[in-house]
Amino acid sequence: MGKLIKLITTLTVLVSLLQYCCEFNSGSISCERTQTLCHYTNPRVWNTYFSRNCELYKNKVSPGFDIVARKYDTAVKPVIDDATVKVNKVAIQPAFKVIHSQCKKWNCGKYYQLVRSPMVKTRRFFFAKYNAFVKPNLDKFFTAEFRSHLKERILKYKNIGHYYFTITSRCIKSKYDFIVGNTEEKLMGKFKNKDTHGIHGSVTREPSSEDMVLTVSTMESDEEELTTTSTQTVVETITLDQEEASAVANHAHDDEASTDVEGSTDVNVNEQALLQEDFDMWSETILQKTQDVIQLFEKDVSKYINGKLVEEANHFKAKFQSLDDKSKKFFSKISLAINDIECVEGIDSETGKKIFFDKSGSTEISQYITRELVREYFNETRSTLDELTNAMEKDLSEITDEIEKKVNAIREENVEVFEEWGDIIVNEWSKRMAYVDVINAHMGADDDTTLDEEKAKSSVNWKKFLKGKKQIIESRDKLAHHSADLSRVNAFRQKVQKKILSFTQESGEFLYILRSKANLQFQERERKERERKEREKAAAEEFQRQQELLRQQEEEDEEDVSYTSTSTITTTITMTL
């Protein structure tokens, strides 16, 4: 079980590295097998295949795969790309410089085969492109007469080259047999097997004096046997080529149009074969191009959103800091006012006006704290904080709209790129198919069966062409309606809104606490003022009562003095009498 897990882990790592290399070098992979390997090890390709062919997979597995793919593209891939760039800059490039400086001294002759292999692949690639795009255009300028003369010259120089090649090959084999081995037999076999029709039946003459030159310098029996074989091959080839040359000349003089039809038939067959092969790959090419454009769109959107959110996160951080500072300033102002509610009244000795001190009596305050003043402070704080939070919400909404507009612009740009690519592809394909139809209509084969087959192939190709064109249109609509991943934008917006709501709730609760504290302070001050007034009133009443009692006592004293005076006068009068 442990070995199986290790094997699965190793395969997973290898496939992941292969896919990363394929994606990183998607534009520079020229090997068809490598492209095929990259294609059939791509999880996205299999996901698309199973989604089209399995309804259960499409409903149950594909949505989860899409989520994982988006998370990889947005969270993992950027980190890997950055790490790759850093490693390439720090380690790989310096290492390549050192290796390059050492490789300058190497002799690369022994690596000929390593260089030859990609050159052969490149030659095959250009040859295929030549047959597909260049050769049809060249055939338009080469008439039948020109082709016949050109073919005669080619056959002539081919015979001469064949003759000298045989001599050179024999000399090389005689001197470097231990290196060359059986190269001559292989090469001569290619020339001999190139066209064996009618060779044995057409050779009737003996070797000429020119041909016998090849056997003059033979010294051993094995060399003589080999030389005889080579001479016979040359004679057969020359005889065949002369017959072909005479036949071509007769055709050129007798019927110029028949040669044109013959050449065009070959072109037609090649074009039909190429169309059949290319149509099989066209659908897959469109799907791959669609996936590439979608990946490019998601990559551009992810890159833009990352930069935009980082920038706006810094801006909102500064805004929240400013909001926090202003709120603390307002809260401090209200707290000082609440502390000064319980103030001490005094009289200015110079002006005689009332002045007020804090409850300790050591610091003079600017004004007497009233309910109206504190209420004004609360209203100012609440309105200012509401304006700031509303402005932040408005900015957040504008940022979201800006991101959506930019994403739509990126989508439209990628759709335009795909449309341009599709127009070029459709235009090129229509030209190729129209060219093949012209060949079929004007220079086709005389055989009715072959002509019907070509017409049937042309009809099938045009249907495939129409199907591919519709597929391009459907892919364009898919790109136009492909939804971007705005989850990070929504998360950022929710985070900011949550923080604004949290600040609003906290500031509201703190203002409520300050308001309650202010009410308690005012109630305490009003209670003390009522008690003071009651005491003053009671003291005034007591003072008035004392004054009344004092007045009454004075009146009673005055009455007593009057009575005493009257009694004295009466007594005096009586004694006098």
Curated annotation (Swiss-Prot):
Describe the inactivation phenotype: A combined deletion of the OSW7 and SHE10 has reduced dityrosine incorporation in the outer spore wall.
Q: What else is known?
A: Present with 8640 molecules/cell in log phase SD medium.
Coiled coil (residue ranges): 379-416, 513-562
Write out the annotated subcellular location: Mitochondrion
Decide whether keyword Nucleotide-binding is in the record: no
What protein name does the entry list? Outer spore wall assembly protein SHE10
Which family does the similarity line name? Belongs to the OSW/SHE family.
Q: What does this protein do?
A: Involved in spore wall assembly. May be a component of the mitochondrial RNase MRP (MtMRP), a ribonucleoprotein endoribonuclease involved in the cleaving RNA transcripts to generate primers for DNA replication in mitochondria. Causes growth arrest when highly overexpressed.
- Major place of residence: mitochondrion
Record field: compositional bias (Basic and acidic residues): 525-545
Q: Cellular component per GO?
A: endoplasmic reticulum; mitochondrion; ribonucleoprotein complex
Q: Does the keyword Ribosomal protein apply?
A: no
Q: Where is this region: Disordered?
A: 525-577
Q: Where is the signal peptide?
A: 1-23
Q: What do we know about how this protein assembles, alone or with others?
A: Component of the mitochondria-localized RNase mitochondrial RNA-processing (RNase MRP) composed of one single RNA encoded by the NME1 gene and at least 31 proteins. Absent in the nucleus-localized RNase MRP (NuMRP).
GO terms, biological process = ascospore wall assembly
Q: Where is the composition biased (Low complexity)?
A: 564-577
Keyword annotations from UniProtKB, A to Z:
Coiled coil, Mitochondrion, Ribonucleoprotein, Signal, Sporulation
| Top-level division of the source organism's lineage | Eukaryota
